[in-house]
Amino acid sequence: MIRFFALSLLLGSMASAASAADVVVEIRGVEARAGALQTSLQTRSEFMKEKGLRSVVEQPAPGVVRITFSNVPAGEYAFNALHDLDGNGRMTLSKSYIPSDGWAMVGGEKLQGAPTFDDVKFVVGSDNMTVRVKMTYFDGNIPSANPAR
């Protein structure tokens, strides 16, 4: 009987390990600026909300920042990063609704407007994976909107 329970526990832990993976997110292009880097791994129901399935806040070094989310259950997720330059804890927008803070999402460089979950989602399976994103900083200006630049 004890052997049965021990075997059940072992098989149960193997099954849960097989359905979860570590997700490493490489954030490229982080600039040397003040403010915390807020990152979040989110399900569809958590998308663009304050907290996700897993969240990490850190003071970033410039260059590439790596964030590891351990034992992520298989499924569809979005990742977003906010370099909170003004320290207010949320995305700051200019009068023309352009982000004043740095930000990154999977596929973010292709976005033409506000993202949807389907625009930026990726799939986590049972294998560990690395996702790469690039920080975007607008500084309140869009170069193509100002021909003098």
Show which residues each predicted segment covers:
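Acidic, glycine-anchored loop motifs typical of Ca2+
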Residues: 85-92
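Sec/Tat signal peptide C-region and signal peptidase I cleavage site
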Residues: 14-20
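Extracellular beta-sheet/turn segments enriched in Thr/Pro/Gly and aliphatic residues
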Residues: 101-139
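A short, amphipathic beta-strand motif
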Residues: 23-29, 39, 133
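Sec-dependent N-terminal signal peptides
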Residues: 4-14
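A short tyrosine-centered beta-strand micro-motif
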Residues: 77-81
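A glycine-anchored, Pro-Gly-centered beta-turn/N-cap motif
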Residues: 63, 68, 73-76
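Short, ordered, surface-exposed loop/turn motifs in non-cytosolic proteins
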Residues: 32-49
